[in-house]
């Protein structure tokens, strides 16, 4: 059973300070003196992705109420409200309430003037005029409530209803962001309307909102209209509450609330913003941050499984010669994860050319170049985090906007969600490229010709009857191909809309949805990678345990059969021949592999003892004895490994102290063990797919995030 996200995240929260509110306090307690670009509230060039994930976990897992003031909402707060049900309220600040009331009063004085969306029509119909400002808001909602949802409760009861609706967490996040934006007092939306939204959130009432139908140009008009209609008690609005779907009217009555009547501009103020796109983007980016940390952890584990070189992550290569900040960050993370590993090569000894023949001098690109590959992706995600922090926490997205200081109404394009859409394009590409490096690391590890003597397909028994990870190899290719397709831009598909008025638009919600979909596919791929790499480090542990007994055995048999002729130099040549052959015949079954290995090694003995009197009989006797003893030894080591309790797995003593944390999490808490094989055991166990599914669920639920933070902190 995976640990509770809340229990782990709370411990992280207790160790971190709330930087936003501390910054506000440092400004005399008045956050409203800050500008929208208040740098102290946002990621800086010194901020690492690990810092960001720690902060998100802390804010999301906090137990205090989120106070919305238009300036200090963090992305972690949005995650907390959306996924953890953190309660929210409009901050108890006289300044906020005064500003909101003043904007409402200023608008009242402008009702005789031509104000867009208050006395005029909407969009391309802004050439119409009306004096009935209240009815105009109803007309706005009427034409925007045009999405496709089930026509009866039976559709929801049969599980068909939510396939065309936004995830409930996205709607909750959108409501939180919209209230936060409206507290800034630029939209003339009354406190009572904002409190209607927070009451819905705090009573667990979530509007059912269509998945599609917005181009995120003049905000997310249609999705936000469904939210606005719900708080007015629209008779055809559906909501989710207490695990049930019911009408908004029923939910309002059930929870003892009151519907609101929208005043002038309040319908427009509710729907003319980017909150839905920003909410989906925030959740997608949060997941992408965690997947990035997991990709780095998997790189470290793959280095261990492949007996790779820690030197690829040396500070000289990154901090000194090519000091891109996020490349340095990724290299440092992987280097830190490898500290203390008995698998990874930490100190390379210079060797002569003749002693190095046939040996791969350095790791292949997927491991060696991973900081250079992942670093720029991390940079894009950190930038996306800064953009979304501004969008969700410190921005007014509406039109027109009220400028109280200058007593003006500004008509502009503050609703355009291109900033959100652009971050999602870059994030989704980063997600696809993370998948690419994971796929290449994984397939190298599964390939018997590339994986430094690991068994073919990571089979724990004879490869002729165990193809363990072969299906996963194919599945990983499918996931990677799909990621490549999803990486294509959405923004290039903009179409002119709404009488040509919205001739350019952002498609931000579509892009955010595609990014969330890409995250899901990457989660499948990384779950597959994690399953395989843990099997690989277990098999490598068996190899290391075998080597401890195997090398003395080779020494003993050389001396037993060749006496004083078996010098250290002869032994060294024979040993090199053996290990070279073991990297070439790892797709053979056990008995065939050892007989083949010592047939080849016999040639090394002949070469090493050239000029000495050695009979063919003694050579053959040595070859047969070595093969038989090696076969028996391998079987003994295997049986000991599988008989041992999982908590005493040999891999634990070879892994680094930090990668050991992730290994133990999967093996013990998620409950996915190393696999020996159905054919060998003579019975069918839990399928490979079920075990990968368990890891996938640990990723998707968020349980793995605190584990990754613990590893890297």
Swiss-Prot record:
Major enzyme class: lyase
5-imidazolinone (Ala-Gly) cross-link, chain position(s): 217-219
Gene name linked to the record: PAL
Domain of life: Eukaryota
Protein name as annotated: Phenylalanine ammonia-lyase
Subcellular location: Cytoplasm
Organism, as annotated: Rhodotorula mucilaginosa (Yeast)
Family membership: Belongs to the PAL/histidase family.
PTM remark: Contains an active site 4-methylidene-imidazol-5-one (MIO), which is formed autocatalytically by cyclization and dehydration of residues Ala-Ser-Gly.
Biochemical pathway: Phenylpropanoid metabolism; trans-cinnamate biosynthesis; trans-cinnamate from L-phenylalanine: step 1/1
